[in-house]
UniProtKB/Swiss-Prot annotation:
<dbReference type="GO" id="GO:0050661">
    <property type="term" value="F:NADP binding"/>
</dbReference>
<dbReference type="InterPro" id="IPR000965">
    <property type="entry name" value="GPR_dom"/>
</dbReference>
<keyword id="KW-0641">Proline biosynthesis</keyword>
<comment type="similarity">
    <text>Belongs to the gamma-glutamyl phosphate reductase family.</text>
</comment>
<dbReference type="InterPro" id="IPR016163">
    <property type="entry name" value="Ald_DH_C"/>
</dbReference>
<dbReference type="Pfam" id="PF00171">
    <property type="entry name" value="Aldedh"/>
</dbReference>
<dbReference type="GO" id="GO:0005737">
    <property type="term" value="C:cytoplasm"/>
</dbReference>
<protein>
    <recommendedName>
        <fullName>Gamma-glutamyl phosphate reductase</fullName>
        <ecNumber>1.2.1.41</ecNumber>
    </recommendedName>
</protein>
<dbReference type="GO" id="GO:0004350">
    <property type="term" value="F:glutamate-5-semialdehyde dehydrogenase activity"/>
</dbReference>
<dbReference type="InterPro" id="IPR015590">
    <property type="entry name" value="Aldehyde_DH_dom"/>
</dbReference>
<dbReference type="InterPro" id="IPR016162">
    <property type="entry name" value="Ald_DH_N"/>
</dbReference>
<dbReference type="InterPro" id="IPR020593">
    <property type="entry name" value="G-glutamylP_reductase_CS"/>
</dbReference>
<keyword id="KW-0521">NADP</keyword>
<dbReference type="InterPro" id="IPR012134">
    <property type="entry name" value="Glu-5-SA_DH"/>
</dbReference>
<dbReference type="GO" id="GO:0055129">
    <property type="term" value="P:L-proline biosynthetic process"/>
</dbReference>
<dbReference type="InterPro" id="IPR016161">
    <property type="entry name" value="Ald_DH/histidinol_DH"/>
</dbReference>
<keyword id="KW-0560">Oxidoreductase</keyword>
Length: 420
């Protein structure tokens, strides 16, 4: 496909998306819910087709030499399809955000003012190897009354296509425009460049992928961007941490799934914790098969690898973690400020004042206490699904669910009221 053809294709998709968005903006909540539940049923009916398409993508990924983490993100199986289906049903059951009254008040002038949620319009989602993003993004945009243009990575091309077909089945059954959820039907990278320039057709771009993709989108987009940067997540074991809680959380935060953005990439151990309990957290990780890149006295633990400066502030997405000793919560905070990506940090402590200091003095999108960073997920937050974890400070932060995909307008009611 040459450049002219890609430009025309994307313009046509944009025009259709804008028309669909105008209709979706006033669609009844029951019709959107019906579409999502029907899409879930279609996903089950098409599961063999989806798995066959995913097999083709996995073969393509292996030929390209994708990393184990990327292959894990790409892979679908019956359990993961069930997870997608449950995600669709969960989003369907969420309260519809469109039209919700955020605030209302009366003015001395006699005016009654309401601030209510409205759709953003058209959302463009650019993502890499995760085919489930097709379903999550499509569902959340539909729930929030937005049309969406999906541009998946070349690795998940066939899987995304099969999932997209199920989403459109749901739209048809509910009598909603199929153009509400469109997929860019080409691997040509020129389509991404076109999306980033489509200010007349797209209201916001959501990039979902690695640092390279997000950086490209931020540098070149003329459309506003919800940035999802790297998940350089930290776990800090305070001197007053409960040992058994700490052992459970650290192991889960690193090893449950290493290829997701909520996986812990750096472990900070307070010197007081080390004095009480020894290097037990490091030993647990080593026994689980994690490569521990350790600094200072932790590098003396048998089986560890000496950390290099570049290991801190790095997203491994693998069975690797950086580790160092810190003197108190303030040193942990300073380290996270320097090396973190404003994604998710967890403190392990039984001291309320220390936890509050950690919460107040860090400004990551998600801060946790005595909980695994792997909970940094829209589904786990009760949103049904997420379109990404926004690490910026404008508009949306943290898991981006249906509510975060809305703006607002003011509805002002008077009674022949005039301004003097």
């Amino acid at each position: 496909m040459d450049g002219t053809d890609v430009t025309m294709l994307m313009r046509e998709i944009g025009v259709r998306a804008r028309a669909a968005a105008a209709e979706l903006a006033f669609a009844e909540p029951s019709r959107k819910e019906e579409a999502l539940n029907a899409a879930a049923e279609a996903m089950l009916a098409r599961s063999d087709e989806i798995l066959e398409a995913n097999g083709r993508d996995l073969a393509f990924g292996a030929e390209k030499g994708l990393t184990p983490a990327m292959m894990d993100r790409l892979k679908l199986d019956a359990a993961r399809i069930d997870g997608i289906v449950e995600g669709l049903r969960a989003v369907a059951g969420q309260p519809d955000p469109v039209g919700q009254v955020i605030a209302e008040w009366d003015r001395p002038s006699g005016l009654h003012i309401r601030r209510v949620r409205t759709p953003l319009g058209v959302v463009g989602v650019i993502y890499e190897s995760r085919p489930n993003v097709t379903a999550d993004a499509g569902a959340l945009c539909l729930k929030s009354g937005n049309a969406v243009i999906l541009r998946g990575g070349s690795e998940s091309f066939h899987s995304s296509g099969a999932i997209h077909a199920a989403l459109q089945d749901g739209l048809r059954q509910a009598g909603l425009p199929v153009d509400a959820i469109q997929r860019v039907p080409t691997r040509d990278r020129a389509a991404v460049a076109e999306m980033l320039r489509m200010v007349e057709h797209i209201d916001v771009i959501v990039p979902r992928g690695g640092k390279g993709l997000v950086g490209l989108v931020q540098a070149e987009a003329r459309v506003p961007v919800f940035a999802h940067l790297e998940g350089i997540c930290h776990v800090y074991a305070d001197g007053e941490a409960d040992l058994e809680k700490a052992r459970r959380v650290v192991l889960n935060a690193k090893t449950r799934r290493t290829g997701i953005c909520g996986s812990a990439e750096c472990l900070l151990i307070d010197r007081a914790f080390l004095a009480k309990h020894g290097p037990v957290l490091i030993e647990d990780l080593l026994k689980a098969g994690v490569e521990v890149r350790a600094e200072g006295e932790l590098a003396q633990v048998p089986g560890t690898v000496p950390a290099q400066p570049e290991d801190f502030g790095r997203e491994f997405l693998d069975m690797i973690i950086a580790a160092k000793v810190v003197d108190g919560v303030d040193e942990a905070i300073a380290h996270i400020r320097r090396y973190g990506s404003s994604h998710t940090e967890s403190i392990l402590t039984e001291n309320d004042a220390t936890a509050e200091r950690f919460f107040r003095r860090l400004d990551s999108a998600i801060l946790m206490r005595n909980a695994s960073t792997q909970f940094a997920d829209g589904g786990e937050f009760g949103m049904g699904a997420e379109i990404g974890i926004a690490t910026g400070k404008m508009h949306a932060r943290g898991p981006v669910g249906a509510e975060q995909l809305t703006s607002f307008k003011y509805l002002v009611t008077g009674d022949g009221t005039i301004r003097t």
